Amino acid sequence: MSQILTSRQADELHRALIAYLTAANLPNTAAALREELNLGEDVFDPATAKKYEGLLEKKWTSVVRLQKKSLTPLVTQIMDLESRNHILQSELDNATPTSRQNKDPVAWLPRAPPRHTLQSHRDPITCVAFHPVFSSLASGSEDQTIKIWDWELGELERTIKGHTKAVLDVDYGGPRGNTLLASCSSDLTIKLWDPLDSYKNIRTLPGHDHSVSAVRFIPGSGNLLVSASRDKTLRIWDVSTGYCVKTLRGHAEWVRDVCPSFDGKYILSTSDDYTSRLWDVTVTNPEPRVTLIGHEHVVLCCAIAPPAAYQNLAAMAGIKKPPATSSAEFMATGSRDKSIRLWDARGTCIKTLAGHDNWVRGLVFHPGGKYLLSVSDDKTLRCWDLTQEGKCVKTIGDAHGHFVQCIRWAPSVIKDVSVNGDNGEPNGTPKKGAAVTPDSQIRCVIATGSVDLNVRIFAN
């Protein structure tokens, strides 16, 4: 006892024990202890006994409270570690060997930590887009600016100013040999910027009556750009003239996102009206070819599957032979109902992917066709294996410190790249549906943007 307690502490413990035994109506035991410790009536009188009465119980309950206080966060931490261990074990069980993954772009998936965290925006990041060839990345923010980064070096190259409200989306594309950057904003406008002329604003496209939510160059068209707006419409623009050539009406509420098919014939849109619509834009007056109904809340994002994914998605849909076209045969949508839905061209939901704990903000198909990637307000990036019925095989927890609002995959590099940086991929995906061909090379690079003001680069 003397090795643990000082003489004074030991004496106080003895007195507290005697007081406890006396109060517990155990006088014989108390007397035996007093005799053993040589604590006579002159030393341990009634006043002293009163002083130490209840002291032992107080000390004991304090220790119990301290143990609970100390153990509760420890138990939580253990449960969290067990959960992470379960996720990692699941990834290990479902993954190919790491060495093969690193060497095979078709099997590559992002992993933490990111290669770069790009910081400069002063308000939440809303969008990101890769240059089709060069190592340039554009990011848009609620701070009204667009920033151009070198994603390989992790360095800021320039800040573009021109919009007077939040920048909501950006995309690279345009005429062959003359890649442009398009941006759209809550200021109701779309702006075109020339990367070859220090990102000079070469044209502003007015016409929408409310915030412009999304912009995408249409593959194969060269000059055509599609936009989605809170005014409930989509518009198709000729970027060489600045004229709106078609207006698509059909949604009952805010149109949130838009994605053109790989052959440029179809456009998929999502809306606050809980629906997504597939439009045939080859006709003079486009109308929805099919309306996708099933989500229980606002549909925030969409993606059209590359032909490389058709075999996996066809099997999931129970189709023996995958489609041979490069049109919008399969699609994915993400919603505030926390789910992702996979659809076929007939408008049938072939699978619902559940796992996110908050709004699904962004979707992108792996160019190799095996995976679908998603980001969410739950701060995670998830990878869904289309060869395993859409099973979630990888989760990057805390991919950001706040809501993850956007995700883009760097477009594949085509071997016959022109000197001006056009590779036939106006919207970051190969022309004519050739998602992965002998003449293209997958770039294993992903960018995400968040409310935490950071853009993150995940790369092999």
Curated annotation (Swiss-Prot):
It is found in: Cytoplasm, Cytoskeleton; Cytoplasm, Cytoskeleton, Spindle pole. Disulfide bonds: none annotated. WD repeats lie at residues 120-161, 163-203, 207-247, 250-289, 294-354, 355-394, 399-439, 441-460. Residues 90-115 are annotated as: Disordered. One of its GO terms (molecular function) is dynein complex binding. Signal peptide: none annotated. GO terms for cellular component: cytoplasm; microtubule; microtubule associated complex; spindle pole; transferase complex. Residues 90-100 have a biased composition (Polar residues). PROSITE patterns: LISH (PS50896), WD_REPEATS_1 (PS00678), WD_REPEATS_2 (PS50082), WD_REPEATS_REGION (PS50294). Residues 74-96 form a coiled coil. One of its GO terms (biological process) is cell division. Keywords: Cell cycle, Cell division, Coiled coil, Cytoplasm, Cytoskeleton, Microtubule, Mitosis, Repeat, Transport, WD repeat. Pfam families: LisH_PAC1, WD40. Residues 9-41 form the LisH domain. InterPro entries: Dynein_regulator_LIS1 (IPR017252), G-protein_beta_WD-40_rep (IPR020472), LIS1_N (IPR037190), LisH (IPR006594), PAC1-like_LisH-like_dom (IPR056795), WD40/YVTN_repeat-like_dom_sf (IPR015943), WD40_repeat_CS (IPR019775), WD40_repeat_dom_sf (IPR036322). The keyword Cell cycle applies. Positively regulates the activity of the minus-end directed microtubule motor protein dynein. May enhance dynein-mediated microtubule sliding by targeting dynein to the microtubule plus end. Required for nuclear migration during vegetative growth as well as development. Required for retrograde early endosome (EE) transport from the hyphal tip. Required for localization of dynein to the mitotic spindle poles. Recruits additional proteins to the dynein complex at SPBs. Dimerization mediated by the LisH domain may be required to activate dynein. Self-associates. Interacts with NDL1 and dynein. PANTHER family: WD REPEAT DOMAIN 5B, WD40 REPEAT PROTEIN. Belongs to the WD repeat LIS1/nudF family. This is Nuclear distribution protein PAC1-1.
